[in-house]
């Protein structure tokens, strides 16, 4: 069996694209091989500057094969038959026919002769290279090919020999290159083992998994050796894996003068901008140390550490300057600047947005002065120098500036946390922060949908699905008893260009997101039976109904309801139940139970005690079973029949006060 080695050597590829490229090229090569009936073992390795394919168990030749291609019916128009013949360069007389479903069809038998695999591999390779779609790609120089970064070399070896192929301006060879620390030393290789070994000798670890393991082990060992804690950060690990061909973990220190900065500023500078790992003491407190991954083992590691500390110091010096500039102004004084900051082209500026948020907060919690103050100031930090440089610190810098001004802790916390939750795993805000977060998200959701930014199957650029889920989680976690229909109406009316169509669209969207949220824990039929725009109420009902229907009594009662509902069908039942028309004991007993439990069920619903309401409904099981077993609803006397239908209607209406049982 034969072996193929391919390397696409380029300038540095973005780290966040490498893992997808590894999976993508593996799938593409595997699929194309299978389509050509080449069943090989395929591996793909991706690093900062190279994508490598290693395929083994390749046959020397491909077997001859025949493929039947179905053509038109023999009764098809002559033009269609001639077109099929022309496409396959044959005459009609040369085409065999086959009977399919009592109809004769022409067929063309495509024969493929056996070929040496090295003849078709260049075609396969070029097809695979072109088939992978990068999120972004580029042209360079005067060349016609397009790729993620400029390609500099193609190595392609089949069974120890260069496989003749060309991609754009590049002709395949047997050369690869070592790490930049080795001055990109040219390495001539013969096969995969030789290739991997020579790369390792020249400070390139081919396997992504090995680089990741080295980084994780190095981070943990170095942190432990200094009795420090490193928090798990798989996303950052994945990124630095894509930045280093030969990773070495080193320890640096933050200069003392920068420790007066908020820890979030330090963390953002290190993690987001420098790709450094923050360290904490055993009690979880932030420490002035960090770990970073060097791309290569340098003879003077201390010089590398000093260089990284110097780069970090430059960035933190800027942050310190920005912070001092910002605190010279109050959050209130920045409100005028928000008029120049656009929220959305169709929805005005951020000053207008905070006015709407303030109105919504006042609607939700009238006379809550701290909430209103937080609402007015919650976006002021967006026009600060710090947030301009570190956008991920929005809200956080507002919190520190509010504290610096002497505003109380409740206001500062609300400003900080009103962007939460930013995803399903994020913590939820509480207190005034929860109300402010709700108001902000609701205004964004309503406004952007009015502006025509409703999410589609192909995109949700403003993350409105996430915003809606955030609203739902805030309401449920904080048990906010809100009439969401009224709240949406209020929010919509804050916009001039609103309509009933907008309202219906927003409510429908919100209900769908609520269904999406609840279906993790409840059957969709249960959700449809109880969902309304009071989500706390909906949650109580779901819990009660789920527990109720697990029991046999609940299942039997549901069946009884369905039987009653089916008997009524589409009939419009009018009129009250007349007890004087009862002629059997079961219908008398059933009516007595209904009269007894009806006010109790209404009281239980008012108290939101849905378990009690369902238990009261359970007391109908015996009399309703007796009724169905012993009473003929469609009596020969129309008055009696109508009265019994009214009795069943009473039962269904009583059930429907708790939930829409017809949806179960």
UniProtKB/Swiss-Prot annotation:
It comes from Rickettsia africae (strain ESF-5). It is found in: Cytoplasm. This is Glycine--tRNA ligase beta subunit. Tetramer of two alpha and two beta subunits. Its EC number is 6.1.1.14. NCBIfam families: glyS. The lineage of its organism: Bacteria, Pseudomonadati, Pseudomonadota, Alphaproteobacteria, Rickettsiales. Its main location: cytoplasm. GO terms for molecular function: arginine-tRNA ligase activity; ATP binding; glycine-tRNA ligase activity. GO terms for biological process: arginyl-tRNA aminoacylation; glycyl-tRNA aminoacylation. The keyword ATP-binding applies. InterPro entries: DALR_anticod-bd (IPR008909), Gly-tRNA-synth_bsu (IPR015944), Gly-tRNA-synth_heterodimer (IPR006194). It catalyses: tRNA(Gly) + glycine + ATP = glycyl-tRNA(Gly) + AMP + diphosphate. The keyword Transport does not apply. Belongs to the class-II aminoacyl-tRNA synthetase family. GO terms for cellular component: cytosol. Keywords: Aminoacyl-tRNA synthetase, ATP-binding, Cytoplasm, Ligase, Nucleotide-binding, Protein biosynthesis. It is an enzyme of class 6 (ligase).
